[in-house]
UniProtKB/Swiss-Prot annotation:
Signal peptide, first to last residue: none
Top-tier EC class: lyase
Names of required cofactors: FMNH2
Classification of source organism: Bacteria, Pseudomonadati, Pseudomonadota, Betaproteobacteria, Burkholderiales
Described purpose of this protein according to its UniProt entry: This reaction introduces a second double bond into the aromatic ring system.
Organism: Variovorax paradoxus (strain S110)
Protein's UniProt name: Chorismate synthase
Family indicated by similarity: Belongs to the chorismate synthase family.
């Protein structure tokens, strides 16, 4: 199986299966000399970790990360960094009944047809559990980008099912299990309780941002920053759509309002999402993703088995009624990995480039000039 490595200069190779002994990744290209410990990574893994509330899967994995290589005396050495996360709470017997059946909405059918074999336990390689190593790698990228550029990556849920979530403050996001930017999440909790009792699932919309991004990241024509971001986000399990900036709202906007006017003190708006012509403009990167409803539900559904016989599929096991609830740190990590890759690329080619443009005195802190 190919397609397991993300990035080139900051390359992350992901390995493992949902119910295997362990999952992990190898990071190749991390600059040397950065202080790094498991504690620097564990915080983001804890944000993504299952079993943290009644609204997510009750699979109880500690997701404790181990650094196996690439760090000496507390600092990165420039050699590959191997990160390992043990699987400790597998319950493979839950998947015995569906081992020869294809669950609607899952990768079962396509994996079987492509490879002629599949691991049905927890989805095997197609499981969202494999996002944990990417969150770990993203934490490494976040740390380097924060230290070198002061970059800040944040995310929140802006919609769950039919419920739009108003933005109140970033301060509310870590205080509730939904990563919602609002103080009172009782409506969201009641909605999820009803959904779970009905044996159904729902989708979600997640917003992620990156602040203090330098101007100049992105490589036209085909490695544009927004193209790479979309590629990364679509690599997250269950993501079905990506928006940059105004996204689909651009359809109803006019050119007189969509184009972000520029003044001596900076941009007036950010409909472009911080990217112009595939290159970062210095504004915040603004990205939203749409996540489909969880495919693993207890309600019976029509399908076939590996012999093409009609079957009624009832999925057992422990599953997220909305995978979007834990997707915020995943989307943050993937955005950080894209930015890390392009910072290294831009430094290699354009590190000595200087222009006559001066930084506007009262421009936002995101609009830094290289």
């Amino acid at each position: 199986m190919s397609g397991n490595t993300f990035g080139t200069l900051f390359a992350v190779t992901n390995f493992g299966e949902s119910h295997g002994p362990a999952i992990g990744c190898v990071i190749d290209g991390c600059p040397p000399g950065m202080e790094l410990s498991e504690a620097d990574i564990q915080g983001d893994l804890d944000r993504r970790r299952p079993g943290t509330s009644r609204h997510v899967t009750q699979r109880n994995e500690p997701d404790a990360v181990q650094i196996l290589s690439g760090v000496y005396e507390g600092k990165t050495t420039g050699t590959p960094i191997a990160l390992l996360i043990q699987n400790t709470d597998q319950r493979s017997k839950d998947y015995g009944q569906i081992a020869q059946q294809f669950r609607p909405g899952h990768a079962d059918f396509t994996y079987w047809k492509k490879y002629g074999i599949r691991d049905p336990r927890g989805g095997g390689r197609s499981s969202a559990r494999l996002t944990a190593p990417m969150v770990a790698a993203g934490a490494v990228a976040k740390k380097w980008l924060a230290e070198k550029y002061g970059m800040v990556f944040r995310g929140c849920m802006t919609q769950i099912g039919e419920i739009a979530i108003p933005f109140e403050s970033w301060d509310h996001v870590p205080a509730n299990p939904f990563f919602a930017p609002m103080a009172d999440v009782s409506e969201l909790e009641a909605y999820m309780d009803r959904l779970r009792k009905a044996g159904d699932s729902c989708g979600a919309r997640i917003r992620v941002t990156a602040g203090n991004v330098p101007i100049g990241l992105g490589e036209p024509l085909f490695d544009k920053l927004d193209a790479e971001i979309a590629y990364a986000m679509m690599g997250i399990n269950a993501v079905k759509a990506v928006e940059i900036g105004a996204g689909f709202e651009s359809i109803t906007q006019r050119g007189t309002t969509h184009g972000d006017s520029i003044t001596p003190t900076g941009f007036v708006t950010n409909n472009a999402g911080g990217i112009l012509g595939g290159i970062s403009s210095g504004q915040d990167l603004e990205v939203s993703i749409a996540i489909k409803p969880t495919s693993s539900i207890i309600s019976p559904r029509q399908s076939i088995d590996i012999h093409n016989n009609p079957v009624e599929v009832v999925t057992k096991g422990r599953h997220d009624p909305c995978v979007g609830i834990r997707a915020t740190p995943i989307a943050e990590a993937m955005l950080a990995l894209v930015v890390m890759e392009h910072v290294l690329r831009n430094r290699a080619q354009c590190g000595d480039v200087q222009t006559q443009a001066e930084k506007p005195e009262s421009a936002s802190p995101q609009a830094s000039f290289l």
